[in-house]
Structures are given as structure tokens and as C-alpha cells.
From Swiss-Prot:
Function statement: Component of the PAF1 complex (PAF1C) which has multiple functions during transcription by RNA polymerase II and is implicated in regulation of development and maintenance of embryonic stem cell pluripotency. PAF1C associates with RNA polymerase II through interaction with POLR2A CTD non-phosphorylated and 'Ser-2'- and 'Ser-5'-phosphorylated forms and is involved in transcriptional elongation, acting both independently and synergistically with TCEA1 and in cooperation with the DSIF complex and HTATSF1. PAF1C is required for transcription of Hox and Wnt target genes.
Assembly information from the UniProt record: Component of the PAF1 complex, which consists of CDC73, PAF1, LEO1, CTR9, RTF1 and SKIC8. The PAF1 complex interacts with PHF5A. Interacts with POLR2A, TCEA1, SKIC3, KMT2A/MLL1, SUPT5H, RNF20 and RNF40. Interacts with UBE2E1.
Cross-link for Glycyl lysine isopeptide (Lys-Gly) (interchain with G-Cter in SUMO2), residue positions: 133, 154
Residue numbers carrying Phosphoserine: 117, 456
Cellular component aspect of the GO annotation: Cdc73/Paf1 complex; cytoplasm; fibrillar center; membrane
Biased composition (Basic and acidic residues): 361-374, 399-434, 442-453
InterPro entries (UniProt xref): RNA_pol_II-assoc_Paf1 (IPR007133)
Main localization, broad class: nucleus
Organism: Mus musculus
Acidic residues bias: start-end ranges: 375-398, 458-470
Highest taxon of source: Eukaryota
Coiled-coil ranges per UniProt: 352-400
Name of the protein this chain belongs to: RNA polymerase II-associated factor 1 homolog
Ranges of biased composition (kind: Low complexity): 502-511
Length: 535
């Protein structure tokens, strides 16, 4: 039933007889009015503020065609309440020494919530779902706790929750399953759009990396305005911009900028001829470009902070779709001309093509290897090393086990005493032979090491003589023991330095090698004798 409001006059009329009742006032509306309440006037003018909430939060309202077609009169002042003085510029100059009104200072203060660390406030901050929330409890709760259930506070919470609910693959197994799932999803046939059910695919093409063009690094150049020349438009401007080049330059004051070069008419003819003859360039021709604009630049690449990966797609008919990487992003903004100074830059860029050198070809091969060759990650390398160690440890354990089994079998299944003695003799002879071979190999290695460290005999003797002469001049008043000790130490240090410089060169023959080994042993024995004398 529709609500009604009874006034004092209506109450008085209710006690009068029906004959004395007055007729209700006639409404200005043709149709019957269901609600007789008159709406109050709007207390303030429209502010043109964007309504941040859902319009259907309280009621789902749908405007009629009459309301949509009606144009409301908006009566405002011609200057919108802002008086602008175009004559005196000092009108809007702010005096920094003026003190603000206390009311304005409060508006400029930052709202800092006081820390609620008291026990009573923590108790009031608890939400008890089974308790009925009366007005007294709600006001008490809002006094101490911070309520986040208001829709005004929840703006943007759904967007934040979408980011937090995304699956983050932290462990290795989840990453592997996610990668395998992509291959499985790629095999499924596409029947409809992922977000638009009524949209169906017309053609399905596979997507692959562009192995053909990946060797060439690509960059995305973004202009702040159309770089086409003003006197040309349409297809001619597009053809000219497709042949354009950018180069870094420096002016007379040492300021760097980017120059935008466009081809001259003769260059356009040469490029058109090359395209018709299906060749990249003519080896002997020279292509001229004239400067058109000057720009300031901002470059971002993989080494820059906040870099985001960017890719572009190439559609090849009958083959598929290929994607390539945009390593660099260059933003160009027009360079401001100095006041009263006209840009006198009239540069001409002369281009002549050549074949790629070895360094450039190596760089292309390195980029191609990024796609073809799989470099193992650190985790894979660590796992491989651990597996190798485990395999090596198992081999050692097997060898130890086999040796112990052999010993046990020999003890258990021993024959006669003569057979045992003969076997022992054979084993001793084999061990002695192998020991001699090992000792000879060890001696040869030791000789090589000594030669590398101490050098040959002749060099060590010359070094010793020179060291003796030098020390004799420097330490004439010292004792014999100190002289002998310094002689041995100096001989060792000089022979070590000389051998380091010599060890890099290979030996020409085996005879010289053996002679130098004998000399190194002699040098080592001399140094050891000198050490014993000093001791």
C-alpha cells in the first residue's frame, strides 16, 4: 500500500462531517499521481564529479526516451565563477610570506591514524559474527576499530584481489606442470573466443618464433607526432617514411640529438629500381638522405630498470604467424628551437652498402643460437653434478665391495700351502713391478715440476753467481751464516721467477727436455744444501 502523510488540517477535517470536507487540490499532472509527497529542492548546484559507485547499487533505474531526449537548462555564469585578469599578471602571483589561516592549515595537514596498540582497542577491533550488532555496539566498534566494510573504501579491491589470486609457480614441479599444460592446451581445437562466446574463429594459424629474422635486432621507435613531411601526404608520404633513417648527431654546443633523415627523389628512384629487380641494393650506388627533423630521445633496453618485454607478429600467407622481439624502445620528442635562433642544420646523409664483416656475422649467429641451443639453467647444472657425484660414489662402493668379496673368497677357498705361496709370490712380483712403474712415473712428474719451478742447471748457477755478487756488495759486514742463508733463499726465489717465465714455451725435443730436468734436480739439490747450511 502506498504511504501517505496526514497533516494537521487533514486530522481536523476527519472529525467534520462529510458535507463540510473540501475537495483535494487539483494536480498539474494529467495522470494519476501515486505518491503525493513533494520532493525537496536540491540543496546545492551540480558539481560535475564522476560518480565512483555502481549505479545499480540501490535501484536499477532505466530512463525513458522522453527523459533521454529532454535537454536540461544549465544556467551558469559566463566566467564559471573564475575571474581572469588578462592585463595585470601580478594578480595571481602568490606571496610566499603570507601566513595561512588556521582553517586552511588544517586542510593541508596529512591524515595520520594514531596507532591503536592498547588492549582495549584490540578487543573492540574483534569481529564477533554470532553477536547481534545493535546501534550501541556498532558505534562502540567504530570508535576503536577500523571498519573496511564500507563500499567507499572497497573501491579497487576487486582489481587488487585479481592480482593476488594469480597462481605463482614457486617450486620446480609446478613450473614443469604449467609448461606441459601449455603444450596440451595448444593441441586443443579453438571453437570460440575465450571471452566472447558468439565469436567463432575464421582461420587458425600456428605461432612460431621468427627464425628467419631473429638474427636482426629490432627496435620500436615512437614519435610524439606524425613525422611525415608537410608538403606530401598519402601513399607518397608512406613510401618516403618507409625509407627513412635516424642517426645520432651533435650540435656546435656539444648537445646530442637524433636526426630524422628522409630520402631524396633520386634515392627513391634507386630504391624503386632495386625493388623491381628484386635485389637489396646496388653495390656501387650511393644513396643520399636529407635531414627533416630533430628529436630528443629516451631509450629503454633490457639493461634498463623497469624494462617490459615487447614482441611483434608477422603474418605470412600459407605459412603461419611468426613473432619477433623488440629489444629496444626509443621515444622521440621534438627538439625545441631556441628563441630567436633558426635551426641552420642542413645535413646530408650519404649511405653506401657493404657486406657484413666477421664481427657482425658472429653477433647474428649468437642471436640465432638463443633460439636453437638450449642453455641449461643453474638448477639443472647442479642436479647433473650431484648425479655424477652419486654415480662416482656408487662406483667406489662397488669397487670396495668387490675387493672385500675377493679377500673373503681367498680366505674361505684357500688351496694347498704351495699354491698359496706361489700365488703370494706372483702377487708380490706384480705389485713390485707396478710399484716400480708408478715410482718411475712419479719421479718423471717430480722432475718436470722441479724444472718448471727451479729452472735448468745453467740458469740456476748463473743466478746463484749473480746473487752471490749482489749480496756480497750489500752485506759485507754480515756473518757467514747469514750470507749462506740469504744465498740459498735468493737462489730459490730467482730460480722460481726464471722458471715461471720459461715454462710457458714448449720444449723443442726430448733430449733438451731431459737435460733441463737434470739441471733442475741439481738446482734443487743446491738450494736444499744451502738451506741446511743456513739451519
Amino acid at each position: 500500500m502506498a504511504p501517505t502523510i496526514q497533516t494537521q488540517a487533514q486530522r481536523e477535517d476527519g472529525h467534520r462531517p462529510n458535507s463540510h470536507r473540501t475537495l483535494p487540490e487539483r494536480s498539474g499532472v494529467v495522470c494519476r499521481v501515486k505518491y503525493c509527497n513533494s520532493l525537496p529542492d536540491i540543496p546545492f548546484d551540480p558539481k560535475f564529479i564522476t560518480y565512483p559507485f555502481d549505479q545499480n547499487r540501490f535501484v536499477q533505474y532505466k530512463a525513458t526516451s522522453l527523459e533521454k531526449q529532454h535537454k536540461h537548462d544549465l544556467l551558469t555564469e559566463p566566467d564559471l565563477g573564475v575571474t581572469i585578469d588578462l592585463i595585470n599578471p601580478d594578480t595571481y602571483r602568490i606571496d610566499p610570506n603570507v601566513l595561512l589561516d588556521p582553517a586552511d592549515e588544517k586542510l593541508l595537514e596529512e591524515e595520520i591514524q594514531a596507532p591503536t596498540s592498547s588492549k582495549r582497542s584490540q578487543q573492540h577491533a574483534k569481529v564477533v559474527p554470532w553477536m547481534r550488532k545493535t546501534e550501541y555496539i556498532s558505534t562502540e566498534f567504530n570508535r576503536y576499530g577500523i571498519s573496511n566494510e564500507k563500499p567507499e573504501v572497497k573501491i579497487g579491491v576487486s582489481v587488487k584481489q585479481q592480482f593476488t589470486e594469480e597462481e605463482i609457480y614457486k617450486d620446480r614441479d609446478s613450473q614443469i606442470t604449467a609448461i606441459e599444460k601449455t603444450f596440451e592446451d595448444a593441441q586443443k581445437s579453438i571453437s570460440q573466443h575465450y571471452s566472447k562466446p558468439r565469436v567463432t574463429p575464421v582461420e587458425v594459424m600456428p605461432v612460431f618464433p621468427d627464425f628467419k629474422m631473429w638474427i636482426n635486432p629490432c627496435a620500436q621507435v615512437i614519435f610524439d607526432s606524425d613525422p611525415a613531411p608537410k608538403d606530401t601526404s598519402g601513399a607518397a608520404a608512406l613510401e618516403m617514411m618507409s625509407q627513412a633513417m635516424i642517426r645520432g648527431m651533435m650540435d656546435e654546443e656539444g648537445n646530442q640529438f637524433v636526426a630524422y633523415f628522409l630520402p631524396v627523389e633520386e634515392t627513391l628512384k634507386k630504391r624503386k629500381r632495386d625493388q623491381e629487380e628484386e635485389m637489396d641494393y646496388a653495390p656501387d650506388d650511393v644513396y643520399d638522405y636529407k635531414i627533416a627533423r630533430e628529436y630528443n630521445w629516451n631509450v629503454k633496453n633490457k639493461a634498463s630498470k623497469g624494462y617490459e618485454e615487447n614482441y611483434f607478429f608477422i603474418f605470412r600467407e600459407g605459412d603461419g604467424v611468426y613473432y619477433n622481439e623488440l629489444e629496444t624502445r626509443v621515444r622521440l620528442s621534438k627538439r625545441r628551437a631556441k628563441a630567436g635562433v633558426q635551426s641552420g642544420t642542413n645535413a646530408l646523409l650519404v649511405v653506401k652498402h657493404r657486406d657484413m664483416n666477421e664481427k657482425e656475422l658472429e653477433a647474428q649467429e649468437a642471436r640465432k643460437a638463443q633460439l636453437e641451443n638450449h642453455e641449461p639453467e643453474e638448477e639443472e647444472e647442479e642436479e647433473m653434478e650431484a648425479e655424477e657425484k652419486e654415480a662416482g660414489g656408487s662406483d667406489e662402493e662397488q669397487e670396495k665391495g668387490s675387493s672385500s668379496e675377493k679377500e673373503g673368497s681367498e680366505d674361505e677357498h684357500s688351496g694347498s700351502e704351495s699354491d698359496r705361496e706361489e700365488g703370494d709370490r706372483d702377487e708380490a712380483s706384480d705389485k713390485s713391478g707396478s710399484g716400480e712403474d708408478e715410482s718411475s712415473e712419479d719421479e718423471a712428474r717430480a722432475a718436470r715440476d722441479k724444472e718448471e719451478i727451479f729452472g735448468s742447471d745453467a740458469d740456476s748457477e748463473d743466478d746463484a753467481d749473480s746473487d752471490d755478487e749482489d749480496r756480497g756488495q750489500a752485506h759485507r759486514g754480515s756473518d757467514n751464516d747469514s750470507d749462506s742463508g740469504s744465498d740459498g733463499g735468493g737462489q730459490r726465489s730467482r730460480s722460481q721467477s726464471r722458471s715461471r717465465s720459461r715454462s710457458a714455451s714448449p720444449f723443442p725435443s726430448g733430449s733438451e727436455h731431459s737435460a733441463q730436468e737434470d739441471g733442475s734436480e741439481a738446482a734443487a739439490s743446491d738450494s736444499s744444501e744451502a738451506d741446511s747450511d743456513s739451519d
